[in-house]
Amino acid sequence: MSTSRKLKSQGTRRGKNRTPHKGVKRGCSKRKYRKSSLKSRKRCDDANRNFRSHL
């Protein structure tokens, strides 16, 4: 039971965190990364992580 629970929590967490991050990084890097500096990209990533975790 413990293994199943661990796998479930990890899978849901990873799936939710991994896919959006990839899409965000790709979309952000194409549009904002070129225009602004690395600091901005980090901020966008952080905001997205917070937004996703709340969702």
UniProtKB/Swiss-Prot annotation:
Keywords, comma-separated and alphabetical: Chromosome, Developmental protein, Differentiation, DNA-binding, Nucleosome core, Nucleus, Phosphoprotein, Spermatogenesis
Similarity-based family: Belongs to the nuclear transition protein 1 family.
Basic residues bias spans: 1-42
Chain intervals for the UniProt region annotation (Disordered): 1-55
Positions carrying Phosphoserine: 9, 36-37, 40
GO cellular component, one term: nucleosome
Function: Plays a key role in the replacement of histones to protamine in the elongating spermatids of mammals. In condensing spermatids, loaded onto the nucleosomes, where it promotes the recruitment and processing of protamines, which are responsible for histone eviction.
Localization terms from the record: Nucleus; Chromosome
Pfam families: TP1 (PF02079)
Gene behind this protein: TNP1
Swiss-Prot/TrEMBL GO biological process terms: chromatin remodeling; flagellated sperm motility; heterochromatin formation; negative regulation of DNA-templated transcription; nucleosome disassembly; positive regulation of protein processing; sexual reproduction; single strand break repair
Main location: nucleus
Protein name: Spermatid nuclear transition protein 1
Tissue-specificity statement: Testis.
Recorded GO MF terms: DNA binding
InterPro entries documented for this protein: Nuclear_transition_prot1 (IPR001319), Nuclear_transition_prot1_CS (IPR020062)
